[in-house]
């Protein structure tokens, strides 16, 4: 069996004799030559990814002013940085919004970071509390990346091994970290580099760990050299993540890009590339993983819960084709829909990361490192936060009516049951509209005769497993005082009103 060492591979790199290929190129080599010959021939496989990595940020040491200040509240271009460290140390997070509500997420922490990498001036404003050794109360200066002592990028969670795709079952579009999701499953968004993904290429499914990547692994980070410093937050193979660090002063704005997800927040697109030493045949075989080999779950992001419904399972080859067929339920009907797919990450840039890293190694500018420890194994635990669901406050049994009744008959139902909302259903109990006591009053004033003339047909609804908080937001957004609760087949199972929610929150107080 072929066995190499990183030391031997580094010697070949220094001599200009190493064979280095990208993960894309490795697929063809293994297909044509087999894993054994590929392991003998290839020394290093380069990988790459380029996507939105919200859990990113930079530690900055500004140097001491004269007289010195102990910074308490720190702002960079009006974006707050965390200052609970030493006197002039701070951490600026990529997802931090702007303090100006008119700017908000359009210019956040990610934009500050990109501006620094681009060499632009950034306004630093800091407030402090005075001490004998730090007498200054505030400072307001303009700085560039060259002016600060250190700017160390430390990203708690980057480089997802597997990223779920997203779709939306709701009747309105929603705004998420996966971009804008259209109503009624009308698009699917995905993220990730697939066959170029670093952790996919290094994963060992038998041990549920990684073959070569670990603490101390040298990497390509944002156009400079960085290191893996541990497993990332929420690391849980086969959903692995990495915590990485690198010198911001070495980085290239081509591979560090700020972005804003509409109505969600600012984020930082980061280019990460990791070299995988081909130490044996098994590693060579894994480095030939293809898009069609990587399973991607598609979840319904229209369901406002931590555990979202699984809609389908697919792979990156299908997702990259630009369309996908889903079997879904809409208004109680099982339908087959072919919809567009879209990526919120860049495969083109991921390829460029892998190609750039490959050239660095071929030029002898980048040597591999031995990991000093493997990545930890962790079990993700949910937050222990209480939640009240719609079914917990649901008014049952539902009082409903059919659309063929008169205005007077509807008014009698409202008075008899002391209610203000009356869902209108068809012969199968499926929701077709709703009327309120206000609708009745208007109908009488306008001499309307039938329910069909006055009912609202485009009805905002809720589900039993929906959080009450979310329903309250929905009612406020659409300026309504009640929502029918329906099942998966749009049959009415109850109703939630503003009075129900007021009683709930009043009881909490």
Curated annotation (Swiss-Prot):
- Relay the activity regulation note: The ligand-induced conformational reorganization of the protein could be an important regulatory mechanism.
Keyword annotations = Amino-acid biosynthesis, CBS domain, Methionine biosynthesis, Repeat, Transferase
EC code: 2.8.1.16
Any GO BP: methionine biosynthetic process
- Residues holding S-methyl-5'-thioadenosine: 395, 399, 421, 497-500
Q: What is the superkingdom listed in this entry's lineage?
A: Archaea
Give the similarity note: Belongs to the L-aspartate semialdehyde sulfurtransferase family.
Its recorded name reads L-aspartate semialdehyde sulfurtransferase
Protein source organism = Methanocaldococcus jannaschii (strain ATCC 43067 / DSM 2661 / JAL-1 / JCM 10045 / NBRC 100440) (Methanococcus jannaschii)
Q: What is the lineage of its organism?
A: Archaea, Methanobacteriati, Methanobacteriota, Methanomada group, Methanococci
């Amino acid at each position: 069996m072929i066995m190499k060492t990183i030391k031997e591979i580094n010697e070949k790199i220094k001599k200009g004799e190493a064979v280095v290929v990208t993960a894309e190129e490795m697929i063809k080599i293994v297909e044509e030559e087999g894993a054994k010959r590929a392991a003998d021939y290839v020394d290093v496989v380069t990988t790459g990814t380029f996507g939105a990595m919200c859990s990113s940020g930079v530690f900055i040491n500004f140097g001491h002013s004269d007289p010195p200040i102990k910074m308490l509240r720190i702002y960079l271009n009006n974006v707050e940085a965390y200052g609970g460290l030493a006197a002039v140390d701070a951490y600026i997070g990529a997802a931090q919004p702007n303090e100006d509500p008119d700017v908000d997420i359009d210019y956040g922490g990610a934009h500050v970071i990109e501006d620094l990498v681009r060499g632009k001036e950034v306004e630093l404003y800091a407030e402090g509390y005075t001490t004998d050794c730090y007498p200054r109360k505030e400072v307001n200066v303009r700085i560039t990346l060259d002016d600060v002592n250190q700017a160390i990028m430390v990203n708690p969670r980057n480089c997802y091994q597997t990223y779920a795709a997203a779709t939306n079952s709701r009747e309105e579009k929603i705004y998420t970290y996966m971009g804008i999701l259209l109503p009624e499953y009308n698009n699917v968004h995905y993220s990730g580099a697939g066959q170029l993904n670093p952790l996919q290429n290094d994963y060992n499914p038998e041990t549920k760990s990684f073959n070569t990547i670990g603490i101390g692994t040298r990497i390509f980070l944002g156009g400079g050299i960085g290191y893996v410093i541990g497993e990332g937050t929420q690391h849980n193979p086969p959903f692995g993540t990495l915590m990485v660090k690198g010198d911001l002063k070495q980085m290239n704005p081509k591979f560090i890009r700020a972005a804003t997800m509409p109505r969600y927040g600012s984020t930082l697109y980061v280019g990460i590339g990791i070299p995988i030493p081909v130490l044996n045949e098994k590693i060579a075989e894994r480095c030939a993983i293809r898009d069609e080999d990587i399973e991607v779950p598609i979840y319904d992001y229209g369901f406002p819960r931590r555990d979202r419904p699984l809609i389908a399972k697919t792979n990156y080859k299908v997702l990259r084709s630009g369309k996908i067929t889903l079997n879904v339920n809409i208004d109680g009907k099982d339908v087959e829909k072919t919809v567009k797919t879209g990526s919120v990450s860049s495969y083109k840039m991921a390829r460029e990361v892998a190609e750039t890293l490959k050239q660095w190694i071929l030029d002898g500018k980048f040597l591999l490192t031995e990991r000093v420890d493997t990545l930890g194994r962790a079990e993700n635990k949910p937050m222990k936060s209480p939640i009240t669901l719609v079914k917990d406050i649901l008014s049952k049994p539902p009082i409903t009516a059919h659309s063929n009744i008169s205005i007077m008959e509807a008014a009698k139902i409202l008075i008899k049951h002391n209610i203000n909302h009356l869902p209108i259903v068809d012969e199968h109990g499926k929701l077709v509209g709703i009327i309120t006591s206000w609708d009745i009053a208007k109908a009488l004033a306008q001499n309307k005769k039938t329910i069909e003339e006055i009912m609202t047909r485009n009805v905002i609804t809720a589900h039993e497993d929906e959080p009450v908080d979310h329903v309250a937001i929905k009612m406020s957004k659409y300026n309504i005082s009640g929502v029918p609760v329906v099942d998966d087949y749009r049959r009415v199972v109850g109703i939630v009103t503003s009075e129900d929610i007021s009683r709930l929150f009043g009881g909490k107080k």
